[in-house]
């Protein structure tokens, strides 16, 4: 092949001719010219272009020409089946190509868009999680901000007119296990008139070049079509970390598309809330951080919230704990997250089962029948110490299935589980989160 300027010039000439043929309506000729131009451009990128900026610029042009070539290819395929007026470059598509079919179904003619949107349909939460605001212990500041952004605009739309607009982006950040995703579940439950999209990086990252940013674009299009909508992105740092020279082209393009869709020129995001959650907010790109107008710190729970969590996690399970016991547990678990407390309670709930497994003696007691809880029987068996009056030497294997009465959960079970469960959050991470809150956030 000839020298660099000739190859690049040839690619530019071919692209220019393709655009002319496209405008003139010679679509078959234009398609071939676009394809040849892209081949030359890719050759220049691979073997000849110097510098990242030049390569990036050429790749962007290639994507543009390939998109147009795909549209022409689709149109030419359809034209073989039925003649119809083509879409000229730079002109809007006719009504039936935008999805307003004459048959009234409103289906999009673009198969690629349909495929991407079908891929994202799985992110829509159809069945509402049953988590109410009252199930979330503490975090009053975060709950109020979410009600202000989600519930009030739906219930009282007249409040949010003119310059008073609801928040479009809220970032929840804090140590792991403090209830960020749980709060999002509460939002999904309470905002029952909204479409809730729960997104992770695997929903948006594709191995195919250019498909990831199309998925991001289609996610926001789908949210606009189904508004009011909430887009919840868990672990957003995996998608929108700081831009650097070492990151891949694909990662940079995903970030750019997020920036454009969240707050770009000509983008209408009325009725759409983007809710992000992260444990490491300091790695977020500064432009992404700015688009989250409210940045709320979800801290480790305080003593009264921890006491309430012990109660919530015990639920209706029979136990002998008093209010004083719950307060005591709240004081003893300084530095524990909500997830840590959940693990302590789950382990404590297993203690009666372990007592049954290790028991060598059982005794007969009165209690509700397994078949009919309203009927009190006196032949149930419960574990006891060998010196207990009425103790019968036997193991749990000898106890009939419907005759076992397990011990209730008591304070000693809780303390035993607490002694074997350590907190998962370290002091170093907490200091970094507090520093980020001082610089950019607000307390939840």
Swiss-Prot record:
Coiled-coil segments on the chain, per record: 19-82
Database matches in PROSITE patterns: AAA
Entry membrane topology: Peripheral membrane protein
Cellular compartments annotated: Late endosome membrane
Residue(s) carrying Phosphoserine: 102, 108
Primary location: membrane
Reaction catalysed by this enzyme: ATP + H2O = ADP + phosphate + H(+)
UniProt domain MIT: residue ranges: 4-82
Region (Disordered): 77-117
UniProt binding sites for ATP: 174-181
GO annotation, cellular component aspect: centrosome; cytosol; Flemming body; late endosome membrane; nucleus; spindle pole
Example GO molecular function: protein-containing complex binding
Pfam families xrefs: AAA, AAA_lid_3, MIT, Vps4_C
GO biological process: angiogenesis; canonical Wnt signaling pathway; cholesterol transport; endosomal transport; endosome to lysosome transport via multivesicular body sorting pathway; ESCRT III complex disassembly; establishment of blood-brain barrier; late endosomal microautophagy
EC number assigned by the record: 3.6.4.6
Source superkingdom: Eukaryota
Keywords associated with the record: ATP-binding, Cell cycle, Cell division, Coiled coil, Endosome, Hydrolase, Membrane, Nucleotide-binding, Phosphoprotein, Protein transport, Transport
Family (UniProt): Belongs to the AAA ATPase family.
Note on domains (UniProt): The MIT domain serves as an adapter for ESCRT-III proteins. It forms an asymmetric three-helix bundle that binds amphipathic MIM (MIT interacting motif) helices along the groove between MIT helices 2 and 3 present in a subset of ESCRT-III proteins thus establishing the canonical MIM-MIT interaction. In an extended conformation along the groove between helices 1 and 3, also binds to a type-2 MIT interacting motif (MIM2).
Role noted for this protein: Involved in late steps of the endosomal multivesicular bodies (MVB) pathway. Recognizes membrane-associated ESCRT-III assemblies and catalyzes their disassembly, possibly in combination with membrane fission. Redistributes the ESCRT-III components to the cytoplasm for further rounds of MVB sorting. MVBs contain intraluminal vesicles (ILVs) that are generated by invagination and scission from the limiting membrane of the endosome and mostly are delivered to lysosomes enabling degradation of membrane proteins, such as stimulated growth factor receptors, lysosomal enzymes and lipids. (Microbial infection) In conjunction with the ESCRT machinery also appears to function in topologically equivalent membrane fission events, such as the terminal stages of cytokinesis and enveloped virus budding (lentiviruses).
Quaternary context: Proposed to be monomeric or homodimeric in nucleotide-free form and to oligomerize upon binding to ATP to form two stacked hexameric or heptameric rings with a central pore through which ESCRT-III substrates are translocated in an ATP-dependent manner. Interacts with CHMP1A, CHMP1B, CHMP2A, CHMP2B, CHMP3, CHMP4A, CHMP4B, CHMP4C and CHMP6. Interacts with VPS4B; the interaction suggests a heteromeric assembly with VPS4B. Interacts with SPAST. Interacts with IST1. Interacts with VTA1.
Name this polypeptide is given: Vacuolar protein sorting-associated protein 4B
């Amino acid at each position: 092949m000839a020298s660099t300027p000739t190859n690049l010039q040839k690619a530019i000439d071919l692209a220019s001719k393709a655009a002319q043929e496209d405008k003139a309506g010679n679509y078959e000729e234009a398609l071939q010219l676009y394809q040849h131009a892209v081949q030359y451009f890719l050759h220049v990128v691979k073997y000849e272009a110097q510098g990242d900026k030049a390569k990036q610029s050429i790749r962007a042009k290639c994507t543009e020409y390939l998109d147009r070539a795909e549209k022409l290819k689709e149109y030419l395929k359809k034209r073989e089946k039925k003649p119809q007026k083509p879409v000229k470059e730079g002109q809007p598509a006719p009504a039936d190509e935008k999805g307003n079919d004459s048959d009234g179904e409103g289906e999009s003619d673009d198969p690629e868009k349909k495929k991407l949107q079908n891929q994202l349909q799985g992110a829509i939460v159809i069945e509402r999680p049953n988590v109410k605001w009252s199930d979330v212990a503490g975090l009053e500041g975060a709950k109020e901000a979410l009600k202000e952004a989600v519930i009030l605009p739906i219930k009282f739309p007249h409040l949010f007119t003119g310059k008073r607009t609801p928040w479009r982006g809220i970032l929840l950040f804090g140590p792991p296990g403090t209830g960020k995703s749980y709060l999002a579940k509460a939002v999904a439950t309470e905002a029952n008139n909204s479409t809730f999209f729960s997104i992770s990086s695997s929903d948006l990252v594709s191995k195919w070049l250019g498909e990831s940013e199309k998925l991001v674009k289609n996610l926001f299009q789908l949210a606009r079509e189904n508004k009011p909508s909430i887009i919840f992105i868990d672990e957003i740092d995996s998608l929108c970390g700081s831009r650097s020279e070492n990151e891949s082209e694909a990662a940079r393009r995903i970030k750019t598309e997020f920036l454009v869709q969240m707050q770009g020129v000509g983008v209408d995001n009325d009725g759409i809330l983007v809710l992000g959650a992260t444990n490491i907010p300091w790695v977020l790109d500064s432009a992404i951080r700015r688009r989250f107008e409210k940045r709320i710190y979800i801290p480790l729970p305080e003593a009264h919230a921890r006491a309430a969590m012990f109660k919530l996690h015990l639920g209706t399970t029979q136990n002998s704990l008093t209010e004083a016991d719950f307060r005591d547990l709240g004081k003893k678990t300084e530095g524990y997250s909500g997830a840590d407390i959940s693990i302590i309670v789950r382990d404590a709930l297993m203690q009666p089962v372990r007592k049954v497994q290790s028991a060598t003696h059982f005794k007969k007691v009165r209690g509700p029948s397994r078949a009919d809880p309203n009927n009190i029987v006196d032949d149930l068996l419960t574990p006891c110490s060998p010196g207990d009056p009425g103790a019968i030497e036997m193991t749990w294997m000898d106890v009939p299935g419907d005759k076992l009465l397990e011990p209730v959960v008591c304070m000693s079970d809780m303390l035993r589980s607490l002694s074997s469960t350590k907190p998962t959050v370290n002091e170093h991470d907490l200091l970094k989160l507090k520093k980020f809150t001082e610089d950019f956030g607000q307390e939840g």
